[in-house]
Swiss-Prot record:
WD repeats lie at residues 201-240, 243-282, 285-324, 327-366, 369-409, 410-448, 459-498. Its main location: nucleus. Residues 60-79, 136-160 are annotated as: Disordered. The modification Phosphoserine is found at residues 119, 200, 390. Keywords: Acetylation, mRNA processing, mRNA splicing, Nucleus, Phosphoprotein, Repeat, Spliceosome, WD repeat. Belongs to the WD repeat PRL1/PRL2 family. Transmembrane segments: none annotated. It is found in: Nucleus; Nucleus speckle. The gene is Plrg1. The modification N-acetylmethionine is found at residue 1. The lineage of its organism: Eukaryota, Metazoa, Chordata, Craniata, Vertebrata. It comes from Mus musculus (Mouse). It comes from the Eukaryota. This is Pleiotropic regulator 1. GO terms for biological process: mRNA splicing, via spliceosome; positive regulation of G1/S transition of mitotic cell cycle; protein localization to nucleus.
């Protein structure tokens, strides 16, 4: 069906074309709205009243500001006079410890220090700029002050209203005073860490690491689907555990029982009895890969996080799922537990951190400051604070409500892991194989490490997936993409003189987040 076009007369078409031309070239749609004089006057009057109301109508005395002939009246603001100026406008000589010339570029001489009194039109501005009575008294009685009055003149008296304004009206002016900018506190000196040992044995990426409470051995999980137990002192392999059918993503050793817990990309969470070296419990419920796990320090509770956007709380003994913590909109990459509230902290690929109520199984606080995935969270062992790692920044927070403390900028990579010890050394490991060490209190980056990959590995397989301090905090262990575990320890020969703190105080920028 063809739609009929309505026909118009030539007269109508011409005038429509003319209107379009006027709208394009003559119309004033883009011009600013003309100024309304009446509203502009009211606006200026209100501004004057608000800003200058207290001093807008000051009482001025013409006799005190201008006089003819000899000294026939008391000068309200006394100055010394020249006797040669009898019968003329009185000229004043301002004397004191800091004389000023009459204008810029004028040499400072006895003549150029003479200033003529202001005219009546300038009297108002002079009255506003008068000093307070307290300041005049201090100048008059000070050791280097000058006498600003005529011989025999009475003490300077100022109107009561002016006194109250100048003495109490410093509220607005206080914002104009220069305040000392806060500076970064000096960081504590920490000895540098150096590579001590490289342990090889896994056939795939080493994805997780944990040290047992007795500090005798440590355990690692790998992409080769095995869990290996190593002697901490010698670095020798003690035991290999097989059972997972995909990459092992998390391991942890219980402090309350001889159990080892592991999780992997096969959706399985296993409990291993280390007396028999076999699996005694499975925890079923996650719908996708399990990325991390942690044990509650005082309760028999296990918490796991998964790619299915949930974290689950398990009863260790009964294998029952106590709570399913739902709220994240993407994979939950890391989880941490503590005895104090909030007892569970999760970080997710949806860029948020959530603090959970363990009893209710609900979110207490959601932190949205990060702009990219949060892959690592670490709790300080002594302070009531924690840190989170993301490709945009490392951020420090304080419990219980997640108050922001500071940013630790400079590690420009995807941060996979964080670790901190009681001395305040924070370690961040990234996917490009770099490891940065920070002072926890000040956020000062005192060392950067990029260890060489194991011979035979590709350079692209340089990456740190996990790191942990041993129980004595004298050794740092890293799980890396070149299929090795690297052990670092402090350089015992280093001193503050050989490795000084390169501390350059900066003005701290007040950042919102």
């Amino acid at each position: 069906m063809v739609e009929e076009v309505q026909k118009h007369s030539v007269h109508t078409l011409v005038f429509r074309s003319l209107k379009r031309t006027h709208d394009m070239f003559v119309a004033d749609n883009g011009k600013p709205v003309p100024l309304d004089e009446e509203s502009h006057k009211r606006k200026m009057a209100i501004k004057l009243r608000n800003e200058y109301g207290p001093v807008l109508h000051m009482p001025t005395s013409k006799e005190n500001l201008k006089e003819k002939g000899p000294q026939n009246a008391t000068d309200s603001y006394p100055h010394k006079q020249y006797p040669a100026n009898q019968g003329q406008d009185v000229e004043y000589l301002v004397t004191g410890t800091h004389p000023y010339p009459a204008g810029p570029g004028v040499a400072l001489t006895a003549d150029t220090k003479i200033q003529r009194m202001p005219s009546e039109s300038a009297a108002q501005s002079l009255a506003v700029a008068l000093p307070s009575q307290t300041r005049v008294d201090a100048n008059r009685t000070g050791p280097a002050g000058s006498e600003y009055r005529h011989p025999g003149a009475s003490d300077r008296s100022q109107p009561t209203a002016m006194n109250s304004i100048m003495e109490t009206g410093n509220t607005k002016n206080s914002a104009l005073m220069a305040k000392k900018a806060p500076t970064m506190p000096k960081p504590q000196w920490h000895p540098p860490w150096k590579l001590y040992r490289v342990i090889s044995g896994h056939l795939g990426w080493v994805r997780c690491i944990a040290v047992e409470p007795g500090n005798q051995w440590f355990v690692t999980g790998s992409a080769d689907r095995t869990i290996k137990i190593w002697d901490l002192a010698s670095g020798k392999l003690k035991l290999s555990l097989t059972g997972h059918i995909s990459t092992v993503r998390g391991v942890i050793v219980s402090t309350r029982s001889p159990y080892l817990f592991s999780c992997g990309e096969d959706k399985q969470v296993k409990c291993w009895d280390l007396e028999y070296n076999k699996v005694i419990r499975h925890y079923h419920g996650h719908l996708s890969a399990v990325y991390g796990l942690d044990l509650h320090p005082t309760l028999d509770v296990l918490v796991t996080c998964s790619r299915d956007s949930t974290a689950r709380i398990w009863d260790v003994r009964t294998k029952a799922s106590v709570h399913t913590l739902s709220g994240h909109t993407n994979a939950v990459a890391t989880v941490r537990c503590q005895a104090a509230e909030p007892q569970i902290i999760t970080g997710s690929h949806d860029t948020t951190i959530r603090l959970w109520d363990l009893v209710a199984g609900k979110t207490r606080v959601t932190l949205t400051n990060h702009k990219k995935s949060v892959r690592a969270v670490v709790l300080h062992p002594l302070l009531y604070t924690f840190a989170s790692g993301s490709p945009d920044n490392i951020k420090q927070w304080k419990f219980p409500d997640g108050g922001f403390i500071q940013n630790l900028s400079g590690h420009n990579a995807i941060i996979n892991t964080l670790a901190v010890n009681a001395d305040g050394v924070l370690v961040s490991g990234a996917d490009n194989g770099t490891m940065h060490l920070w002072d926890w209190r000040t956020g000062y980056n005192f060392q950067r490490v990029h260890a060489a990959v194991q011979p035979g590995s590709l350079d692209s397989e340089s990456g740190i997936f996990a790191c942990a301090f041993d129980r004595s905090e004298s050794r740092l262990l890293t799980a890396e993409a070149d299929k090795t575990i690297k052990v670092y320890r402090e350089d015992e020969t280093a001193t503050e003189e050989t490795h000084p703190v390169s501390w350059k105080p900066e003005i701290i920028k007040r950042k919102r987040f």
